[in-house]
Amino acid sequence: METVKELVQFMQPNQRLDLKAVALTHVLGLTGSSEGKSAILSLDEMLMAIFGLTFDANQTVAKDAVLSLINLTSEEEAAIKVFQLAKQLQPPFAIVEVAAKEITNEQSDLADPWSMVLSNLTRVESLVHEILDTLERDDHTLPRLAKAFAQLDYNKKKAKLHYLAPIFCNLTQVSRGRELCCHRKYELLEKLLPFASFEGSVVRRGGTIGILKNVCFDTVYHDVILNEQSSILVAILQPLCGPEEFSDEDNELLPIELQYLPESKTREEDPDLRKMLLECLLQLCSTRRSREILRSRGVYEILREYHKWEAKVGKDSDCLLACENVVDILIKKEEEIGLDNYKTEVEVPAEQSEKFVQEDAAYVKSLLD
């Protein structure tokens, strides 16, 4: 502890560059272990020094400071500690504003590490509303973040910005985040949709699919999702589609974007993501109107072929079961189902509902680790 405390004096903005760099390199190494993180988190003056060095004129020093924050915010309790201390300082260290500013700065060398810090902070559900307050303070911030995510060459210093996907996914943990994502004012969801099939990054793809699942769990948005002018259903189905040929009769049911797919078309390779997509469809089966729309758009036909592929190629039992859960509903006549709304007429035990949320949160976290 004393050794860590002694480093603080060398991490002041006006200190010699070589001393700052050596001290911060040591601190960054400490953040890689649970013991080191505990020691640093117990010293407010050390955290304050790290905050200050994120603004250092030397890019290597600034980057090491931000990388330290990534490690220090990787667990919920620690993330809360960092967030609260940053807020309590006089003047405050505006960690969310700084992150958003760096992410949306096309010339920033630190956009990727700052996006990972913000991803860690937004993962903590108890912080999401306060983070949204900050992001909404300026009407331009959310649209700029969406633009930075949607435009692959946005950052001129070659930052990938893949972690914006889990940031948006984390924000949609809460109803306010889902509302913002679906609101016409920002049209965030439409900008994010293409990346549900993005082959270049499982983090970007997984975060986008997580957004879709969070929105699908909220029946308020089912009409938006299933609107004929919306591309959301296509974004959910496309990763589940393969190169199989359909009869003309079946093809007429499918959305035009999913008709006559090329022989090179492949399905989502990650079984956890396939399962999340299938769970999206299961949630969309909650009302009679939604079920009828799904049937009319060839969802059963797509899942019929998908099930054959999963049984022979994918071979994931959880995905097979998730597919069968949807198919079992779609093949039934409404008279057999006898319910207009599964969610209001069939009560899901609270502990089971909580388990679903925890499992999904754990999976998204596994993508980031």
From Swiss-Prot:
Record's signal peptide: none
Pfam families: DUF383, DUF384
Name of the molecule in the record: Protein HGH1 homolog
Intrachain disulfide bonds: none
Organismal lineage: Eukaryota, Metazoa, Ecdysozoa, Arthropoda, Hexapoda
Organism domain of life: Eukaryota
Gene3D superfamilies with a match to the protein in the record: Leucine-rich Repeat Variant
Family that this chain belongs to: Belongs to the HGH1 family.
